[in-house]
């Protein structure tokens, strides 16, 4: 029998948000969503720094509490910076999130993702189609978007099994595949998260923001699984509230409402009652 996600991670849900400290999150990311990610971190009272020059790594790593590596915009220089940061994080025990943006689209990103995995990051995430490609399963994703064809019950179970195999080689890494149902897999278990609304797929940067939120929670000392489950659930609940308040507005208003809720929802005592998900 499955167990409710809020029962499994009860303490984390009760204490993680609002933040009681302001973790500094170093983000090596893309130009498309960098402003959204920085503001999302500020909205939850974390602190962002978008520093991707290797020459500054020793000083920034000495100050930061977590690292986010996002593959959203690749160049030769950025690839080298991502690889260098991954190694630096492993050497300094910096909590790290790898966001596999576009890994289902090109061989270069697939190879880079696996190079970064060798450093045993805390979290590796992507949409369902990206994570299927990363796990060497057939993926029907196009560009950086996930495909509905990859989100059937059978496909989700297949991906869960493949990611569980990956945890045998990387037991300290938690894997997240986002979609209509979000899949979280680690050496400790498998969880389905079931919040969210379709509109979240219709403005750019939602996955990037989730990666930043996970990194912030890791920076407070939360363990990998709890950081992933709380961050994903919180962001999806923000989207649900925004959708309920924006029944006649367009997507731009929905986007603004979702981002507004990042700074508001955690102060609502009953937001935990919104959370839906289960342990398998």
From Swiss-Prot:
Catalytic activity, as annotated: 5-(2-hydroxyethyl)-4-methylthiazole + ATP = 4-methyl-5-(2-phosphooxyethyl)-thiazole + ADP + H(+)
Species of provenance: Lacticaseibacillus paracasei (strain ATCC 334 / BCRC 17002 / CCUG 31169 / CIP 107868 / KCTC 3260 / NRRL B-441)
Keywords: ATP-binding, Kinase, Magnesium, Metal-binding, Nucleotide-binding, Thiamine biosynthesis, Transferase
Protein name: Hydroxyethylthiazole kinase
EC class: transferase
Keyword flag Kinase: yes
Binding site for substrate: 50, 205
EC id: 2.7.1.50
UniProt GO molecular function: ATP binding; hydroxyethylthiazole kinase activity; magnesium ion binding
Record-stated family: Belongs to the Thz kinase family.
Pfam families: HK
Top-level taxon in the UniProt lineage: Bacteria
This protein's pathway: Cofactor biosynthesis; thiamine diphosphate biosynthesis; 4-methyl-5-(2-phosphoethyl)-thiazole from 5-(2-hydroxyethyl)-4-methylthiazole: step 1/1
Cofactors demanded by this protein: Mg(2+)
Gene Ontology biological-process entries: thiamine biosynthetic process; thiamine diphosphate biosynthetic process
Binding sites annotated in the UniProt record for ATP: 125, 178
Role description: Catalyzes the phosphorylation of the hydroxyl group of 4-methyl-5-beta-hydroxyethylthiazole (THZ).
